[in-house]
Amino acid sequence: MITRMSQLFLRTLRDDPADAEVPSHKLLVRAGYIRRVAPGVYSWLPLGLRVLRNIEAVVREEMNAIGAQEISFPALLPREPYDTTGRWVEYGDALFRLKDRKNADYLLGPTHEEMFTSVVKSEYNSYKDFPVILYQVQTKYRDEERPRAGILRGREFIMKDSYSFNMDDEGLEESYQLHRKAYQNIFDRLGIKYAICSATSGAMGGSASEEFLAVAANGEDTFVRSTESDYAANVEAVVTQVPPAQPIEGQPEAKEYETPDSETIEALVEWANSEGITIDGRAVEAADTLKCIVIKVNDPTLDEEGKPRGESLAGVLVPGNREVDMKRLEASMEPAQVELADEADFKKNPFLVKGYVGPKGLAANGVRVLADPRVVDGTSWITGADAKNRHVVGLVAGRDFTPDGFVEAAEVLEGDPSPDGKGTLALARGIEIGHIFQLGRKYTEAFDVKILDESGKRSVPTMGSYGVGVSRLVGVIAEQMLDDSGLRWPASVAPFDVHVVIANKDAAAGEAAVELVETLSNDGLEVLFDDRPKVSPGVKFKDSELLGMPLVVVVGRGFADGKVELRNRLTGETYEVDYTDALPEAKRALRGEARP
């Protein structure tokens, strides 16, 4: 197929868009692939849509290869199925809700577990129908509080979601592994650098869960890898190694001190060392102190009377050398929503003294206290004494205070012990491109799905859920592959295989370029032909670099000697070949083979 730039709906821009935050967003807009409609909502222009469709084709091929069958659900969905699973409430503000003219509640689908479960219940009733894997490539909607980075974090996006239904857990494991391998095939074919990480399930529910994270310095997800094993995990899923409990007997009594102007950990440590306080004969460090962070918890789960538990305060205890990681805290508290207490909360609760909050004061006022797993019995801490300019030294867990529970809320630091006991953790950044879950029977039980099993009894099938961010992959590939000159697309997803540029006004050169374009097209290559008559060679070259086709063929000054120039955008190579060798050289370059 041949597409002439003189006829292509395309406008490239020389300046970066004002709202762009990451390089891929800037280049996709400048190169005319996407255009912003509203925050987190984008239109796909011809070049961008071609990339998107190419990625969808790879995804469909790999899903079909594992026996999955494609269906399609609407994006506009009724409320009732999401009430059945509780997710109408659990999704909180992230859900787009609307009403029809009859005042009935609807939503724009963020994900479709409920619908897949319902359709399987309505169509199948015997174990002979199982296992089954269904998938769709569908537009999803989530009302992100802060949409950012263009199509990397949008409010409308395209996702491939698939669901497996099996009669037993062994079958679920097989379906899970099929998807795991299919995802590896997809991302390998797309040329993406990625890591497979243990993850939390969040509002999806279920047990086993893994994320596929594209490695990116500006990714919004932090993940860790062990220096001595294959362990990798999203930082939200890292489980703290719990130290052994310490003996309580014989420890000195806790002592309260006047600590003027010591609202920060840094100031508290400085005060302690100026007073000559020591810990096991050494100077006090930040890790010897205990931060007490006050949070608001909005819990949608129901109490014994069937009412939502609603909003309450809680205190989170973490060692003073670590910050509270809100993502880890949110993951630990699911499905509750959490946020830091604000000035109004402190004014409303005078027992909360900012900078001096401690676990004893919280417990005395009925506030739930959640501790980092390192706060084991017998550990001694310097922490707030619940009065301005006062701290307590030697407050011992299990003697002077007892947490109501434990929570993974402290930030993970470079060099922390690996949870598998092998080596230490190294931090990296990534962008989530895929997520696979072993959901179990959460949804099939909620919808009372009963299937006749081999023994003649009614059994509840088990589910898996598997997602790929299809539209996000466009941004991820752009982000990983771009260079200083523009986009660079791998051949598997590029809008066109070859970009032919006429850079010679000679009529014979123009005719030869047309003939070359037809030769390439007749051999099955997708060709973008820059035939614009009133555009200078310099502008054409700039556009060819910005647009990012894997191979650029220039019919320029060298044509007088029977030569054309090949520019490989992926390797950076530029070289001349005989005009008659342009086709085989182009095919070799697109296969990624080295020059002979």
UniProtKB/Swiss-Prot annotation:
UniProt-listed Enzyme Commission number(s): 6.1.1.15
PANTHER family, alphabetized: MITOCHONDRIAL RIBOSOME PROTEIN L39/PROLYL-TRNA LIGASE FAMILY MEMBER (PTHR42753), PROLINE--TRNA LIGASE (PTHR42753:SF2)
Superkingdom of origin: Bacteria
Functional summary from the UniProt entry: Catalyzes the attachment of proline to tRNA(Pro) in a two-step reaction: proline is first activated by ATP to form Pro-AMP and then transferred to the acceptor end of tRNA(Pro). As ProRS can inadvertently accommodate and process non-cognate amino acids such as alanine and cysteine, to avoid such errors it has two additional distinct editing activities against alanine. One activity is designated as 'pretransfer' editing and involves the tRNA(Pro)-independent hydrolysis of activated Ala-AMP.
InterPro entries referenced in this protein's UniProt entry, alphabetically: aa-tRNA-synt_IIb, aa-tRNA-synth_II, aa-tRNA-synth_II/BPL/LPL, Anticodon-bd, Anticodon-bd_dom_sf, Pro-tRNA-ligase_IIa, Pro-tRNA-synth_IIa_bac-type, Pro-tRNA-Synthase_IIa_type1
Localization terms from the record: Cytoplasm
Catalysed reactions, semicolon-separated: tRNA(Pro) + L-proline + ATP = L-prolyl-tRNA(Pro) + AMP + diphosphate
Assembly with partners or alone: Homodimer.
Enzyme kind, highest EC tier: ligase
Species: Corynebacterium jeikeium (strain K411)
Domains (record comment): Consists of three domains: the N-terminal catalytic domain, the editing domain and the C-terminal anticodon-binding domain.
GO process terms (BP): prolyl-tRNA aminoacylation
Protein name per Swiss-Prot or TrEMBL: Proline--tRNA ligase
Gene behind this protein: proS
Keyword annotations from UniProtKB, A to Z: Aminoacyl-tRNA synthetase, ATP-binding, Cytoplasm, Ligase, Nucleotide-binding, Protein biosynthesis
Example of a GO MF term: ATP binding
